[in-house]
Amino acid sequence: MTEGVEGRSQERSDLAGFAARSAESRGRKYQEAFRDHRPAFERDRDRIIHCAAFRRLEYKTQVFVNHEGDYYRTRLTHSLEVAQIGKAIARRLGVNEELTEALALAHDLGHTPFGHTGEEVLNRLMEGFGGFEHNLQSFRVVDQLEERYPGFNGLNLSWEVLEGIVKHSSPYDRPVGVIDRFLPGVVPTIEAQIINYADEIAYNNHDIDDGLKSGFITLDQLDGVELWREVHEGIARAYPDIDPERRKLQTISALIGVFIKDLTTTSLENVQRLRITSLDDLRRINRPVVAFSPATAEKNRKLKGFLFENLYRHYRVERMRVKAERYLRQLFESYVKHPTLLPRKYQKKMEILGRERVVCDYIAGMTDRFALDEFKRLFEPYERV
């Protein structure tokens, strides 16, 4: 990778020795003549914010389909929450906040409409054609699919951002396979490791909020979860006259704080115990250092188990999943059978990428709303085309 001149003096001078630094980046795929001197990771963050795929996250959902209500989280609000949590952790660990923020904002760019159901459906439909995995799709978005700059496709992000995207993992993800450009088998930067946990902290706690708002879960049910009960009771003791709604919101806020404090304390202990003083040390030791303590990890496991059984498998969520699968399957099969239904620029890509992959890219880029409207246009006789 090569890179034009980017700002070096503007980078924080108080970063920990094991932090990633823009000045030490492995560079970009394409050399550019930059018009200003922003540090590399700051530029990456800005490019992600201004790309089309990031804007579309506003109408891609987490658990609830977009038209179910305006209150519920979308992929955009989730990404912003991950960025806030990730930066808070990065600041406490003394690592690069700009790289952390860039990774947070990019981590869901490859997500399909209709949450994880969309990913599961596309992966089944793409069996025999390379499959589908949202981390790899996020990489495709920033490396190939965005069309903004003269001379190249993609966003031409720094090597460290791309590495963090392809090595992102959460309980929903599967291994993304070997990508030779990004040190396969080697742990990513601490900033990338932070995002794995910030992602989980954000969706666990904010799915509680959305689940309570929807009525799919109740406070009585949550009181059976040890960690929630401890914090919920603590808020009541601290604020005896607090109303139930504010108590709920303050409990969620305090839970996030509990996770951040435990994660940073445990991670710093790991860094010190392993005597990691540089990014090279981290790569050489090749062990993740960002982690919860065993006690908090167990409490978090129970919280996730509660959400899985009571929210993600709620019968109304299951109904949304079944409908979403029908929409995406019929769209995919129709586009593959009749490629002229796609915009011309996608038809032109089929000779190079193959019909199925182009259709997959097109559907993966849809918002919930666009997918629903497209389904109506194709399959409802009185809908305008």
Curated annotation (Swiss-Prot):
Pfam families: HD, HD_assoc
Positions of the UniProt region annotated as Disordered: 1-23
Compositional bias ranges of the Basic and acidic residues kind: 1-14
Source organism of this protein record: Geobacter metallireducens (strain ATCC 53774 / DSM 7210 / GS-15)
Keyword terms, alphabetized: Hydrolase
GO process terms (BP): dGTP catabolic process
SMART domains, sorted: HDc (SM00471)
Example of a GO MF term: dGTPase activity
Domain of life: Bacteria
Name used for this protein in its record: Deoxyguanosinetriphosphate triphosphohydrolase-like protein
Keyword match Metal-binding: no
Family: Belongs to the dGTPase family. Type 2 subfamily.
SUPFAM superfamilies membership: HD-domain/PDEase-like
Gene3D superfamilies named among the record's database cross-references: Hypothetical protein af1432 (1.10.3210.10)
Domain HD: start-end pairs: 75-204
